[in-house]
Amino acid sequence: MTSGINYVAIVLYLFTAIGIGFFLLKVREMYQRISAGQSDPARFLKKRERAKLMAKEILLHTRMLRFTGSAIAHWFVMIGFVALLGTLITAYGQIIEASFVIPFIGTWTPYRYFVLAIAWTTAVGIVALIGIRQATRFFHKSRTSRFLGSRSLKAYYVEATILAVVICVITLDYLEHQYYVNATAVQTVAAIKIWVSVMWFIVISSDLTMGVAWHRFLAPFNIFFKRNIDSRPALGELPEMISHGKPINFEDPKEDDVFGIGKSADISWKGLLDMASCT
């Protein structure tokens, strides 16, 4: 452990504190924007059923099964986003001491192979999604493409970040299990992993319209508060028209009742959540 590595560790810890602080401020700002929407009390009914539906749709990707190839790839990337969190925690210890592992589970062989399996499947998944998006972009240029008119730079950045993180995870595992461990190499890759991860938080915090990244945090809430808590799609029959959180009495409407959406202030908070999580 050299003074140079100590210096790098201090810088990365400060960088992380700034990045997470900025991220939390922007989460608060997004919450304020969404909560400023019109009331929709029905979204808070039957919380237990909603929680079950959310878990089912997230874990099984039931709404994406019709896109079999991309659904499987997306599922692995989603799992990797959560399951590889432990490797980021490990990296913060490794920039000080290359042999650092998470207490209790860090030396457990099944955990090591679990992380490796998730890292490799996430890598394959994100490469598959990149390939699918590029193929769709080049071979379906008509309005049938869901990417028509979209800006690709943000998607490229998210894809590159995910790929860089899993490459770091796989590389670190290789370096950690050499007969002669190169401490400098381990600490360097761990530092890169931290920098890439924190930079991602800073970039998405700088753009609250970056739904391709924000949906990773917002999707569970979007599913939990969906209109129907069964298999029916939201784009079915028209819902009861409400104003200020209450059904409109068309026989005797109030003077301040809002019929439909005439301006952004008329959008419900759920509608604003939908737009924020749109990819």
Where are these regions (language model features)?
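Membrane-embedded alpha-helical bundles of multi-pass integral membrane proteins
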Residues: M1-W269
